Amino acid sequence: MRIWWLLLVMGACTRSVFSQDTCRQGHSGIPGNPGHNGLPGRDGRDGAKGDKGDAGEPGHPGGPGKDGIRGEKGEPGADGRVEAKGIKGDPGSRGSPGKHGPKGSIGPTGEQGLPGETGPQGQKGDKGEVGPTGPEGLMGSTGPLGPKGLPGPMGPIGKPGPRGEAGPMGPQGEPGVRGMRGWKGDRGEKGKVGEAPLVPKSAFTVGLTVISKFPPPDAPIKFDKILYNELNHYNVATGKFTCHVAGVYYFTYHITVFSRNVQVSLVKNGVKVLHTKDSYMSSEDQASGGIVQELKLGDEVWMQVTGGERFNGLFADEDDDTTFTGFLLFSSS
């Protein structure tokens, strides 16, 4: 503030010198009293950011923080150095009793102490080792006679004595018990092969051909296609089967129907024993029949169309057959 007052005084003197043309410069006046404080000036604009200040002094250590979360187990560290032995610590609290150590060596016999109080009876100890055999004792006196013992085991058989004289013949004994069955004897030699039995035979199978199809009615059908007739029991010329072996026979027929209706019968000695009828529709058809009959020697069996030519539609060609079969089941002789 003093600097401001000094500048004001010097300014006033300068103005008075320039205003007086003839005035001389006098001696400096006495400095005036300080003026009153002026009004505070307005805030200046923010200056540019200053340089970074020097680092402050380290603060005082803070208080201990809260315990953090337990971290994962770290890897084992390297073996530390063996430091010098530290100062002996205070005695720790008494630990739990340890296991029994090995038996120590027997110490010297101490002085006999005062008799202690009788303790509780201890547990039974382990069986001790057998001690050495003691010296033989003196022979005792003979004891009293004991009771009679049990009979001993039978001794060995003695040598046979001399043969005695023959005694008188005794009475005849009863018959003995029947003995056990003997062992099975060896198998005998194989016998000679016997003669084969004569089995009676009789069989045939015959059929129609293109020539013999549509046979005439009311007469034995002459089957001229021989499939089997080794014994010639079926006569192709007559169309009849003649019995040469008395017995039971089976007869069967299979017919193809074409262009006309069919009505056939199986005849035995002139008697019709089986009938088959089939009506022709528009294509080939099949029909069949079978029967078992007992025959005597000389009996005759055949097939024939019944009902006229309207019912003789028995057909045969390269692809279709009409057959008649008979054979012996078993003989009655």
Swiss-Prot record:
Point out residues bearing the modification 5-hydroxylysine.
K73, K127
UniProt KW Signal keyword: yes
Q: Does the keyword Secreted apply?
A: yes
The organism's superkingdom is given as Eukaryota
Q: What PROSITE patterns does the record point to?
A: C1Q
Primary location group: secreted
**Domain annotation Collagen-like: ranges:** 24-82, 84-130, 134-193
Q: Tell me the Gene3D superfamilies matching this sequence.
A: 2.60.120.40
Q: Where is the composition biased (Basic and acidic residues)?
A: 42-57, 67-88, 183-193
Q: Which residues carry this modification: 4-hydroxyproline?
A: P31, P34, P40, P58, P61, P64, P76, P115, P151, P160, P175
The segments labelled Disordered in the record are: 22-194
**Molecular function (GO) terms listed?**
hormone activity; identical protein binding
A GO BP entry is: fatty acid oxidation
Q: What is the effect of changing C23A?
A: No change in the interaction with ADIPOQ
Query: Which residues does UniProt assign to the signal peptide?
Result: 1-19
Its UniProt miscellaneous note says: Overexpression of CTRP9 in obese (ob/ob) mice significantly lowered serum glucose levels.
What is its quaternary makeup? Answer: Multimers (predominantly trimers). Interacts with ADIPOQ via the C1q domain to form a heterotrimeric complex.
The protein depicted here goes by the name Complement C1q and tumor necrosis factor-related protein 9
